Amino acid sequence: MKIEWIKEQKNKIIQLLCLVSVPAAAFYLMECYTHNPLSEVRTWAQLFNVILFELIAWILYFLVGRVRTALRIELVIAMVFGLSNAYVVRFRTNPIVPWDLFSWKTAASVASNYDFKPDTHMVVVTILFLAGIALLQFVKKESGTIKIWKRLIL
């Protein structure tokens, strides 16, 4: 009984550590597609972006009910956005901005004029993202997750 309780507490601590560290890693990896975030992003901007990624991770956790699933979703979103942004920066030297959503048809029509071959840097960062997604397999599932309507009320 006591050993079971200790294992449960250990799993909760590991999940909490993952909920704190993985979103920060996702931010830095996403930024690594286009530049070195530690030297080119101001400290306060790094802090607020990491807080934003933490907030997204916790929201996903409350919606999904599983740490592993929430963090995997966040890693996939960060990877896709980072790759998309890297190609946009490569082609027009400006990052993705919200109003780019309105010009997606134009982007699709001229996409055949560009070379989408990834460079070594993109491949390495993508492999690191995929390794992070795979390593989350070792985070134990929660026993007895709360249904979504109960999570939203709490």
Q: Across the structure, where does each feature detected by a protein language model lie?
A:
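Transmembrane and membrane-interface helices of multi-pass
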Residues: 2-154
